[in-house]
Structure formats: C-alpha cells, structure tokens
From Swiss-Prot:
Swiss-Prot/TrEMBL keywords: Cytoplasm, FAD, Flavoprotein, Methyltransferase, Multifunctional enzyme, Oxidoreductase, S-adenosyl-L-methionine, Transferase, tRNA processing
Sequence similarity: In the N-terminal section; belongs to the methyltransferase superfamily. tRNA (mnm(5)s(2)U34)-methyltransferase family. In the C-terminal section; belongs to the DAO family.
tRNA (mnm(5)s(2)U34)-methyltransferase: region residues: 1-269
Stored HAMAP family: MnmC
Gene: mnmC
A single cellular component GO annotation: cytoplasm
Function per UniProt: Catalyzes the last two steps in the biosynthesis of 5-methylaminomethyl-2-thiouridine (mnm(5)s(2)U) at the wobble position (U34) in tRNA. Catalyzes the FAD-dependent demodification of cmnm(5)s(2)U34 to nm(5)s(2)U34, followed by the transfer of a methyl group from S-adenosyl-L-methionine to nm(5)s(2)U34, to form mnm(5)s(2)U34.
The protein, known as: tRNA 5-methylaminomethyl-2-thiouridine biosynthesis bifunctional protein MnmC
EC number(s) on file: 2.1.1.61, 1.5.-.-
Length: 697
C-alpha cells in the first residue's frame, strides 16, 4: 500500500536555486547540486511509518549532518521544508524537524554574516533572506559543545555541535526513542585533511549509536572523483545504508550499536534519566510560578504536552523571578571547564528564547546592551585577570577592554580595565515568565491553578497526590510531577535533603538622575547595576544565607547604595545613586555549592543512606562498593522530578535546563551532554563521594 508522504515534495524544488546558493561547489561539478537536491527530496519524502516507529512523538523527523560550512545546505533544507509546508502545513500535522550538526572548525555569526553579505543573501528582497536572518538571530558563537537553535516557530530545531565530532557525539545521551534517520555529509568533511576527524571508525560508530537501524548516509563530494572507498567501507561496516540502497540491515552492526548504547548507559548508570511513562496524554504537573516553571511549561508545550501549573501566588513571577531587571551573561572560569562551558551554552539559549518571544509580539522588557565586568578590589581584579588571560575567548562571548573603551561602552566614567560580554544585557524576569506561559498556551492545554500552595506530596498507586496547604487535603493526582518552586524547593519530605541553600537578595530601585541616567550597559563589579527602564535602575543585591524573613531591610538598602561607590571610588556618577525612597524588592535565590542548578529525577535520599548503611556494616572491600555505586542507578522517586537551584543566574540558566528536562521527559535528544546532566543531578553531592569510594560523613 502506498504511504502518504510526511511532507509533499514540491515539483518546483529547482526554484530554490540550489546551484546559485552552492556557488563554486556546484559550478565545479553539477553532481553536488544533484546530490543536495537528492538529499532534500529524500528528507521530504520520509514516510510517517518510519518516523512513528522510531520516535515517541508523532511526526518528529530527526536528521544528522556532518559539517556546517557556510550554512548553505542548512538554508536550502530550511527553504525546502518551508516550501513543502505551504502545500502541506507542518503545524497542522504537528511535524517537527530535529537536525544534529557536527562541525570540527569554529563557526560564528560574524563569519556567516560576512559570507552571506558578499553573496547577497542578506538583501531583504532575496528569496532566502528569512532563512539566513533566522540563523543569524541565533547568534551562533565559536564555542565547543551544543548550541540549540529553534527556528520557524520551533518547527525546526538545530543542535550545532562544534569541536571534535567524536568527542561531541560520544557525549550525547541515547534517547529512549528519538533516533536519526538520515545523515548528510558536506564535501569538506570527506576531504583528506578532515576525513579522519569526521569518519574515524569510532566516530562513525557513535553516529550509528544515535541512529535508527536502517538510517541512510549520503556523503557528498564536489570534485569529479567519488567518495573515497575507505569512507564508503567504513559507513557500510558500521551498518549505514546508502540513500538508494534497499538491502537489509546488518545484524552485527545493529548489535554493536546496541552495545554502545548500553555502554554509555552503564557509564552513567548512577544518574538515571527519566523513564518514559505509558500515558503520554496525561498532563504533567509543575509546582512553581517562576522562570523555571514557565520555561519548562513552554518546552513541554512545544512537544505537544499538556501542563498544569500550581502557583502559590495570585500571579506568576512573585518569587526570585519577580525582579524588574536581571542581568544575562555567562559565568566564565580561567580553565573554561564544565561550569564555564555550561554557562556559555545556557546564556546563549536564554538570549535566543527571549528574542524569539519578543519577535513573536510578547512584551518582555529587555535590552541587549552588553555587560561590563570589572574588579572592585585587588582580589577581584586578580580573579578577573585570570579569567581574561586563561583562554582565547571568542570575541562574541567576551573581550578585554581598556578604561577608555569601558567608559565609551558604559557612557559613564570607568577608570579601570574590564571584561565585556557583547551579547549580554538585561531582561525582566517576571515578564519573561508570563510571556513563556502565554506562548505555551497557544500550543497546548496549559492550565494555571493560582493561589494553590502545595504543602506535601504522597506517592499513590496512580501517581503523586498533591495536598493543599490550606486544609491539608488532596487536590489532585498526577503521574508526573516537577517541583520547580524556587525557594520552596526543599519544603517537601522528598526534597528536604537536597544540598542547596537559600540566600536572601534585596534589589534596590533608584531613579535616573545626573550622570547615572546616561548609563548604557549593565555593570557587574561589587554587585550589579542596570541601565534605566521605566524610570528606574536596579542595583544590588544583598546576599544573606538562610534568611529569617523577607521584609525590607534599611541596612541592606544602604549597603546597595555603596556598591558602585566602592567599585569606582574615583568616579562621580555613583554619587547619583539615591536609595532614600526605600523602593526595593526582596527574594530568595537557591544556590548549590558548585554553582550548577539541580535538574532531574528526585533522589530518594533515605534509600541512598540505607544502602550506604549496609555498605558500612559490610566486610566487602571498599572497591567493590565503589564499583556498585558506579554501575547501579541511584535510588529515585519514580515520576517525581526537581528543577531549581538556579542561583543568581537563573535568568541565564533556567530556559536551557528546563529544555533539557522536557527533552528527557519526552525521550528526545537533549541539548546537554551526559556529563553535564550528571553535574546537574540532584544526587550529585552524595554520589561524588561514593563514586570515589569515600565516606559520606
């Protein structure tokens, strides 16, 4: 029986001007333009059966691409999908496209803009302008790791992995269902200078691990010669089919792929990913009403999931997410380790999220005015200098500035050098949360239950019972519950042992006057200061551990007034900071010792300590127990998850961490590596010791 194509192929595909866009590559050999056209046609003709058999969500097509190059092939694919969409709307069919792209060399937005400008692709009347602009709006940076871009109303997700293809591919968690069905390799990837990076046997096996059993692999060449026989043999050996092959799949290769999946799962067995639940139509409950909750609701809604939010207040964003302005910029470290790389990824994604909502017409106060980071004493200056000198940072992430340059950027007198984050700025957190929910409600059923303070949760045969704080009666039962309640994250017996701490923060609101009113950028020194918005600057914030109350504090208000004076004692403009109106806002940030948020399955800490007690009484060698903890899933509460501990940078980290959790809950590819997810695990503080064979106490 003939199958209805997922996307109808346009009979006018040649009108995409493939040869024009591919330029010299196509001119050298018309074979290449034919191959690109063949690949696009194959993608568009993918059948519903192939997708449904390999993915949890209907109409989710997953592609892989080796090489990003100058982005031409991606632009063509976007254009082809859009053209097909006009004939057979993607939104009506709920079709989403996910493309994982691996690029060895660094690519950034400026390089792409320069190339496309020369080619006329950025002319507003060019037929591909919308697609090039969509990619440029993603502000691609030359950093290692995954950068997730959502395009065309999130119908197309591009995960761009930069760095060694092998190193990147091997860190991608194998989703429960979502696998790559089609691969396309750009010409430069199979040239002699690069082929070993892209087509090393270990790399190809990792591609196979991420793919369906009958995935096709099309490698393109721009010269008159065919693809090197060694590459063809490598692909065939690892079980890939050519796009025109009808031979059966290789059982040995399939077994090897499964072995690789099990190997990765065993390597990170201590950090179990959320299992897929049988009732995919059941709404997911979220406790909380801030950035974490709203971001998760939006990411779930984009995957067709219904959501019920329990908010203890009468409106969203009344906790730490209620500030008028929050700074957005990455946390960098001299060694650019996992924490630094994580914050570069999340910062860029948050910026994209906010901008996409603004472009959609949602009202979010924000300004991409950059962030200027300076020292405020000898110790902080030394620490900042180590960061500046520690790496050759991409200029789109940060660059050093002289006092003169800093003054020009800030438009107020800065008498010391600094580090400038050009893509940073500020945004209004509660407006961001409100916009995220409003957008989510246009996609699926997202219901908010206001004034609903959940006092406790109890495991039940049909899920988790939620009890109201008002009369301690059960108000609902849900199969899956995410606790994303900010400062209340540890109030439940299931989460009370999470190793995160609350810190009170009072942010002062000051009127613009004198030189202060001229401030053009966010300043981060001893505290932070934002440019004016709605006739107010924000300056702060205090940092008080385990606060006893959230009342206004005159002492903290006065201390906030001194932060910029202490940072820039030789400048006059800090004297314009007037906090005498006693206008301020107080919130609590939940912070972990290692500065990572917490995300994932809620840990059953009591069960973990019970196992540990057995270990203490055992006469087994410590190495045996160390192996046990390394290979055994840590105890968790099934169907219960946590999302929080965002600290003072929740505006930067919240959206991507929520996106990762949503992907995990839906069995989809995550934008964060398995290593980073392990570092976010709510269990990590205890397991960090147990995995090393150390005592917990």
């Amino acid at each position: 029986m003939n199958k209805t194509p997922l996307l109808s192929v346009s009979p006018n595909l040649h009108e995409l001007h493939i040869c024009e866009l591919l330029g010299n590559n196509a001119n050298q050999n018309s074979r290449y333009s034919h191959i690109v056209k063949q690949y696009i046609a194959e993608v568009l003709q993918s059948s519903d059966d192939k997708i449904a058999a390999t993915n949890t969500q209907p109409h989710l097509l997953t592609l892989g691409q080796l090489g990003f190059g100058d982005g031409h092939e991606i632009i063509l694919l976007l254009a082809a999908l859009q053209e097909a969409n006009l004939q057979n709307p993607l939104i009506q069919q709920q079709t989403r496209i996910h493309i994982s792209v691996f690029e060895q060399g660094p690519v950034n937005c400026k390089q792409l803009q320069h190339t496309w400008q020369q080619q006329g692709l950025l002319d507003s009347d060019h037929h591909l302008f919308d697609f090039t602009q969509a990619l440029l709006n993603g502000e691609i940076a030359a950093i290692e790791g995954c950068q997730r871009l959502s395009l065309l109303q999130n119908q197309i997700i591009i995960d761009l992995y930069q760095g060694s293809p092998l190193a990147q591919a091997k860190t991608i968690a194998t989703p429960n269902k979502q696998r790559i069905t089609h691969w396309f390799a750009l010409p430069h990837t199979n040239q002699e200078a690069h082929s070993d990076q892209y087509f090393h046997q270990r790399s190809v096996w990792e591609y196979g691990r991420l793919s369906v059993d009958n995935a096709t692999f099309l490698a393109a060449s721009t010269n008159d010669e065919n693809i090197a026989p060694t590459i063809k043999k490598q692909l065939a050996f690892c079980g890939f089919l050519s796009s025109t092959s009808f031979k059966s799949t290789d059982d040995i290769a399939i077994a090897e792929r499964n072995a690789l999946r099990q190997q990765l799962q065993q390597q990170f067995a201590y950090n179990p990913l959320p299992p897929l639940h049988s009732n995919n139509n059941s709404p997911i409950a979220i406790i909380g009403g801030g950035i974490a909750s709203a971001s998760l609701a939006l990411s779930l809604a984009e995957r067709g999931k219904d959501v019920i939010i329990y908010c203890k207040d009468d409106t969203l964003g009344q906790g730490a997410s209620g500030n008028k302005q929050g700074a957005i910029y990455p946390l960098l470290t001299p060694e650019n380790g996992s924490l630094s790389q994580f914050f570069q990824q999340v910062f860029l994604y948050s910026r994209r999220r906010i901008q996409a909502l603004v472009d959609d017409g949602y009202d979010i106060g924000h300004e991409w005015c950059g962030v200027l980071h300076t020292g405020f004493d000898q110790r902080s200056q030394t620490r900042l200098d180590k960061i500046i000198d520690g790496q050759a940072w991409p200029s789109e992430i940060a660059f050093a500035v002289s006092p003169h340059q800093a003054t020009q950027l800030a438009n107020v007198d800065i008498d010391k050098p600094g580090f400038y984050y050009p893509l940073g700025g500020w945004a209004c957190p509660f407006e961001f949360a409100q916009a995220s929910i409003a957008k989510a409600q246009t996609l699926t059923k997202v219901r908010i239950v206001y004034n609903s303070d959940i006092s406790s949760l109890e495991s039940h045969s049909s899920g988790w019972q939620l009890f109201s704080a008002e009369d301690n009666t059960p108000i609902a039962t849900h199969e899956q519950v995410v606790i994303a309640s900010g400062a209340q994250l540890t109030q439940y017996k299931q989460t009370k042992n999470l190793q995160i701490t609350g810190f009170r923060g009072q942010v002062s609101h000051v009127p613009p006057q004198g030189e202060l009113a001229q401030l053009n950028t966010v300043i981060c020194a001893n505290g932070y200061l934002t440019p004016q918005h709605n006739q107010l600057h924000c300056v702060g914030a205090s940092y008080v551990k385990d606060p006893q109350h959230l009342d206004f504090c005159p002492i903290e208000q006065h201390e906030n007034s001194l932060k910029m004076k202490q940072s820039f004692p030789n400048s006059n403009w800090p004297n314009d900071i007037d906090v005498s109106n006693n206008d301020a806002r107080v919130g609590v940030r939940m912070v972990s010792r290692d500065h990572f948020p917490v995300m994932g399955c809620a840990p059953d800490v009591e069960a973990l300590f019970t196992r540990y007690a057995v270990q203490q009484q055992s006469k087994d060698k410590p190495s045996l127990w160390q192996h046990y903890w390394q290979t055994t899933p840590a105890p968790i509460y099934d169907g219960l998850y946590v999302l929080g501990g965002l600290g003072s940078r929740g505006l930067s980290s919240g959206p991507l961490v929520a996106e990762c959790l949503a992907a995990n809950l839906c069995g989809e590819l995550s934008p964060l590596s398995v290593e980073l997810q392990a570092l976010l695990s709510p269990n990590r503080m205890w397991l960090r010791k147990l995995l090393k064979g150390k005592a917990l106490m």
